[in-house]
C-alpha cells in the first residue's frame, strides 16, 4: 500500500509518501517569518500555496511513484491555523478527485505520536508531546489517546519561541535559546506552575521578560526559563508514569530535538526503569511523512472521509480522535 500525506497546520508544508514498511519520501518547506515576528496565518498560507505543487513533484520523484500509484491521500485536518490548513486540504482534495483516490483525515498530534512510535519501535508508551502547538502527556487507553496532563494556556514551544523572539534570537528560536542557557550560571526564581497534572507557561514567559527588563544577566534568565519549563514537563510525566505503570516514554514533537529536555527525561526514565525513546530530528518538527504514515494506519483500519465532510478543524482535541489501528491487547 502506498499513501501520500500532506501536512500544513502551521509554518511548514510537507509532502510525505510511505508504504507498509518505510518512508519513501519526506519533502518539507518552512515559512520563516520576519526576524522578531511570529507566524502570520495568511502569509504562511501564501507560502504553502506557492510551494505545494513543487513539493508534491519532489516527493513523487524521490519515492519513484506516480499519483496514479497511490492507494489513498491523507491530509492534516487539524488542529492548526485555518488558512494554512485549507491549503493542504485543498491540494489533497484535488488529488483525490482527479485520480479517484480515497481521502483520509489525520489529526496532527496523533501523527506526531505515530511517526515517533514507528521510527523508535515503541509499542505502548507514555508520550510527552511537545511542540509549538501541543504540550501534553498522553497514552493510549480504551480506543483513544487519553490526556494525563496538558498546558492550561500556551504550549511550551510557544513560550520558549516567544522569549527567543523577545531577545532577538534567530529562527528557529529554541536551539539558540538553549545555547544561551548553557552559558548561564545562576538559576533565577521564576513561576513554576503545575496544578494537579496541568501546567501553565504564560506566566513563566511574562516573568522571564520582566527579569531581562530589570537588567538581569540574559544567560541566567535563559537558563532559568528553559530549566523551569522542562522541569514542569518532567514532573507531570513522572506522575503519569507512576499512575499508568508504563515501561516506555516517547518524546514527540518539535521540542523533542532539545538535548536539555532529553537529559532531564533520561533521569525520569531511569528512576522508573523505563526506556526513553526520542523521535529522530528529521521527524520531530511538522512533516509530511507523519501524515502519510498515520494516514496509512487509519486507511488500513477503514478510515476515510468524503470530500463534503473534509472541512478543516482548527480546534480538535486529541482525545476526540478514535484510534482503530491499535489492537485491544494494548491497555
Curated annotation (Swiss-Prot):
Offer one example of a GO biological process linked to this entry.
tRNA threonylcarbamoyladenosine modification
Q: Does the keyword Acyltransferase apply?
A: yes
Q: What class of enzyme is it?
A: transferase
Q: Which reaction does it catalyse?
A: L-threonylcarbamoyladenylate + adenosine(37) in tRNA = N(6)-L-threonylcarbamoyladenosine(37) in tRNA + AMP + H(+)
Task: Give the binding site residues for Fe cation.
Answer: 108, 112, 286
What stretches pass through the bilayer? none
GO molecular function list:
iron ion binding; N(6)-L-threonylcarbamoyladenine synthase activity
GO cellular component terms attached to this protein's record: cytoplasm; EKC/KEOPS complex
**Cofactor(s) this protein requires:** Fe(2+)
The EC number on file is 2.3.1.234
Q: Cofactor binding mode, per the note?
A: Binds 1 Fe(2+) ion per subunit.
Query: Keywords, A to Z?
Result: Acyltransferase, Cytoplasm, Iron, Metal-binding, Transferase, tRNA processing
**Similarity comment: family membership:** Belongs to the KAE1 / TsaD family.
Please report the name of this protein according to its UniProt entry. tRNA N6-adenosine threonylcarbamoyltransferase
Question: Organism source for this protein?
Answer: Caldivirga maquilingensis (strain ATCC 700844 / DSM 13496 / JCM 10307 / IC-167)
Q: What is the lineage of its organism?
A: Archaea, Thermoproteota, Thermoprotei, Thermoproteales, Thermoproteaceae
Amino acid at each position: 500500500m502506498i499513501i501520500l500525506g500532506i501536512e500544513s497546520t502551521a509554518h511548514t508544508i510537507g509532502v510525505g509518501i510511505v508504504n507498509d514498511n518505510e518512508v519513501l519520501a519526506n519533502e518539507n518547506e518552512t515559512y520563516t517569518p520576519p526576524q522578531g515576528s511570529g507566524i502570520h496565518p495568511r502569509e504562511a498560507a501564501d507560502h504553502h500555496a506557492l510551494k505545494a505543487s513543487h513539493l508534491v513533484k519532489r516527493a513523487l520523484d524521490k519515492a519513484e511513484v506516480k499519483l496514479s500509484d497511490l492507494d489513498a491521500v491523507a491530509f492534516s485536518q487539524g488542529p492548526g491555523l485555518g488558512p494554512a490548513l485549507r491549503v493542504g486540504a485543498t491540494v489533497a482534495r484535488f488529488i483525490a478527485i482527479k485520480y479517484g483516490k480515497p481521502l483520509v483525515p489525520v489529526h496532527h498530534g496523533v501523527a506526531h505520536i505515530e511517526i515517533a512510535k514507528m521510527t523508535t519501535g515503541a509499542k505502548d508508551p507514555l508520550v510527552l508531546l511537545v511542540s509549538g502547538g501541543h504540550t501534553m502527556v498522553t497514552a493510549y487507553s480504551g480506543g483513544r489517546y487519553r490526556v494525563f496532563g496538558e498546558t492550561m494556556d500556551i504550549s511550551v514551544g510557544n513560550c520558549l519561541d516567544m522569549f527567543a523572539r523577545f531577545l532577538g534570537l534567530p529562527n528557529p528560536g529554541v536551539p539558540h535559546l538553549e545555547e544561551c542557557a548553557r552559558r548561564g550560571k545562576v538559576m533565577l526564581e521564576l513561576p513554576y506552575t503545575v496544578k494537579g497534572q496541568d501546567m501553565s507557561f504564560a506566566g513563566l514567559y511574562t516573568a522571564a521578560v520582566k527579569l531581562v527588563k530589570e537588567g538581569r544577566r540574559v544567560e541566567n534568565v535563559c537558563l532559568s526559563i528553559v530549566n523551569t519549563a522542562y522541569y514542569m514537563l518532567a514532573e507531570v510525566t513522572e506522575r503519569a508514569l507512576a499512575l499508568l505503570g508504563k515501561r516506555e516514554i516517547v518524546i514527540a514533537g518539535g521540542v523533542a530535538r532539545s538535548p536539555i529536555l532529553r537529559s532531564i527525561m533520561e533521569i525520569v526514565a531511569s528512576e522508573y526503569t523505563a526506556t526513553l525513546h526520542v523521535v529522530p530530528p528529521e521527524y520531530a518538527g511538522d512533516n509530511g511523512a507523519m501524515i502519510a504514515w498515520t494516514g496509512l494506519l487509519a486507511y488500513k483500519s477503514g478510515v476515510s472521509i468524503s470530500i463534503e465532510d473534509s472541512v478543516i478543524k482548527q480546534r480538535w482535541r486529541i482525545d476526540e480522535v478514535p484510534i482503530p489501528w491499535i489492537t485491544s491487547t494494548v491497555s
